[in-house]
Amino acid sequence: MTQSQYRPGPDANGLFGSFGGRYVAETLMPLVLDLAREYEAAKADPKFLEELAYFQRDYIGRPNPLYFAERLTEHCGGAKIFFKREELNHTGAHKVNNCIGQVLLAKRMGKKRLIAETGAGMHGVATATVAARFGLPCVIYMGATDIERQQANVFRMKLLGAEIVPVTAGTGTLKDAMNEALRDWVTNVDDTFYLIGTVAGPHPYPAMVRDFQSIIGKETRAQLQEKEGRLPDSLIACVGGGSNAMGLFHEFLEDESVKIIGVEAGGHGVNTGKHAASLNGGVPGVLHGNRTYLLQDDDGQITDAHSISAGLDYPGIGPEHAYLHEVKRVEYVSITDDEALDAFHATCRLEGIIPALETSHALAEAIKRAPNLPKDHLMVICLSGRGDKDMQTVMNHMAAQEKQA
């Protein structure tokens, strides 16, 4: 495969192969075209890049460590496992990498109001954080179901000055929150910047979010070179929309010796229908401004996604992931709720790190694979977020298990 096949752009129409694009209402088309122009100009502006680097270093706290997970490695008895510690960022996840980039772009474009959608609440918190830092009003759309299971993050957003709009339509989760945010954007096109949290949405969002997250992979390459003197043998990251994964993967797509694994949320199992594994259990379609793999019924209606992790509970996936799946550069697998919970507990007890439930899906896949790999195999997992937000979910699950016992 050539570079152009693995890293195809996107092209001028926002397409990665047949995925991506700009499927938006007529009222939004001038806005997304303007955003694409502004983003291209910003990328070429040394002042913008200098300001971005300043905030990455002094506000987010980058670079974060590449940590050798010694006890987990011993426990698995195979591959040498490293964690890219995105949970050590300010706000506790990878989301802020993207939010800082987009808020600087909003400021450059003269926008006076931020809106965002959130599932687990981490993107909402990161958006509220940068809104506070830059003195901008901020409205966060969040599904009512997610508000119930992410009370701590809802409170954090309010503390930071954000207005939370509960979304009761549909299943009251991330898909529905994104629908409402898009409606707001159509209504308030002049002064509002829509800060999308993942590598989805109409072009230029998938490429722009990937670019702001690609610092994860760039740092990983340099840090592993320093520690081990070579490339990783495998990369593993969880995939909902897929921004933490794209941030880690993109840097290594041309390095064919590096095996790349994306981990979807298998829920109760892909064969049960109660999951959020768009690539393993979906078909191509159009949602939220782009063509990608989606969970759909026989009539083409979007079906409900399920995952114990609110951040993976989305019935689609970023279009670049769909492309990488089709060209077979990245292997996409699924992990069930129970497997993710087991990995969550193992990481807590072996490494003294409480990972997010999203991240626990990647950890579960690593724990499955590592024992069958040689001891000199270098495996990097994106530790995309910390698990403070998931305490209630885990407590509820443990209480339910005790009742059954």
From Swiss-Prot:
It catalyses: (1S,2R)-1-C-(indol-3-yl)glycerol 3-phosphate + L-serine = D-glyceraldehyde 3-phosphate + L-tryptophan + H2O. Its cofactor is pyridoxal 5'-phosphate. Keywords: Amino-acid biosynthesis, Aromatic amino acid biosynthesis, Lyase, Pyridoxal phosphate, Tryptophan biosynthesis. SUPFAM superfamilies: Tryptophan synthase beta subunit-like PLP-dependent enzymes. GO terms for cellular component: cytoplasm. It holds the Pfam family PALP. Pathway: Amino-acid biosynthesis; L-tryptophan biosynthesis; L-tryptophan from chorismate: step 5/5. InterPro entries: Trp_synth_b_CS (IPR006653), Trp_synth_beta (IPR006654), Trp_synth_beta/beta-like (IPR023026), TrpB-like_PALP (IPR001926), TrpB-like_PALP_sf (IPR036052). The modification N6-(pyridoxal phosphate)lysine is found at residue 95. Its EC number is 4.2.1.20. It comes from the Bacteria. GO terms for molecular function: tryptophan synthase activity. It is an enzyme of class 4 (lyase). Belongs to the TrpB family. The beta subunit is responsible for the synthesis of L-tryptophan from indole and L-serine. Tetramer of two alpha and two beta chains. This is Tryptophan synthase beta chain. It comes from Pseudomonas putida (strain W619). The lineage of its organism: Bacteria, Pseudomonadati, Pseudomonadota, Gammaproteobacteria, Pseudomonadales.
